């Protein structure tokens, strides 16, 4: 029940924030930087241990590395990002594990903006350290592989982001068994793109 209330609250907050933003930021551009704080959560799906929910919050720093490339609707800019997740909770049947994560590999494709929307695709990888084994009976050290699709909603001073994220957590064979956890999450963030220097 808690996970459904969380998803409803995130959806309502996203709709309210979308209505309250106005056009202002130019969005990602070469040489620019992104700073963002975010929070998200979701529930397990098939392919690993079930009956598990995840909540997390963190900070992102990104570097927009390219000018626009590719034709048509694929046109966009490449961004490299790192995420720190000092808040990470895994609600599993045996216990609740608390920990922190670090994603040093964030590969993000920022599509050309459409009005005040700047959609993106992203692949992320990192590590997770928890006070209990995740999943139960395995290991407290895990690796996280993630894929996300979302959009920035550009405002006058800040941008909001709303995304759907798939996260796979496993110990990569550090312990046996290695069933892993697969979750689908909704993430909401607030941040800012800082312009690059003109050359």
Put a short name on every predicted segment.
Residues 31-33, 51-57, 96-103, 117, ...:
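Residues that define the transmembrane beta-barrel architecture of outer-membrane proteins
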Residues 45-47, 92-94, 131-137, 172-178:
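Extracellular loop and loop/strand-boundary signature of outer-membrane beta-barrel proteins
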Residues 1-29, 195-199:
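Cleavable N-terminal export/targeting peptides
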Residues 57-131:
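Gram-negative (and chloroplast) outer-membrane scaffold detector with strong preference
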Residues 39-45, 63, 84-90, 125-131, ...:
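Transmembrane beta-strands of outer-membrane beta-barrel pores
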Residues 24-32, 66-78, 112-118, 154-160, ...:
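Short loop/turn motifs that connect adjacent beta-strands in outer-membrane beta-barrel proteins
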Residues 33-39, 76-84, 119-125, 160-164, ...:
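Transmembrane beta-strands of outer-membrane beta-barrel proteins
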Residues 59, 153, 181-199:
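Outer-membrane beta-barrel "beta-signal"
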């Amino acid at each position: 029940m808690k996970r459904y209330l969380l998803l409803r609250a995130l959806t309502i907050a996203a709709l309210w924030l979308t209505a309250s933003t106005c056009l202002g930021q130019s969005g990602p551009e070469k040489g620019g930087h992104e700073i963002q704080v975010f929070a998200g959560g979701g529930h397990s799906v098939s392919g690993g241990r079930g009956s598990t929910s995840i909540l997390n919050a963190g900070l992102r720093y990104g570097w927009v590395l390219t000018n626009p490339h590719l034709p048509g609707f694929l046109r966009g800019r490449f961004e490299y990002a790192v995420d720190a997740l000092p808040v990470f909770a895994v609600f599993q049947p045996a216990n609740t594990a608390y920990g922190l994560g670090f994603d040093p590999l964030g590969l993000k494709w920022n599509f050309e903006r459409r009005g005040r929307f700047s959609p993106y695709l992203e692949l992320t990888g990192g590590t997770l350290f928890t006070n209990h084994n995740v999943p139960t009976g395995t290991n407290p050290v895990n690796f996280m592989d993630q894929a996300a699709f979302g959009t920035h909603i550009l405002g006058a001073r800040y941008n909001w982001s709303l995304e759907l994220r798939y996260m796979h957590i496993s110990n990569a064979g550090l312990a046996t068994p290695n069933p892993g956890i697969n979750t689908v999450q909704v993430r909401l963030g607030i941040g800012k793109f800082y312009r690059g220097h003109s050359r």
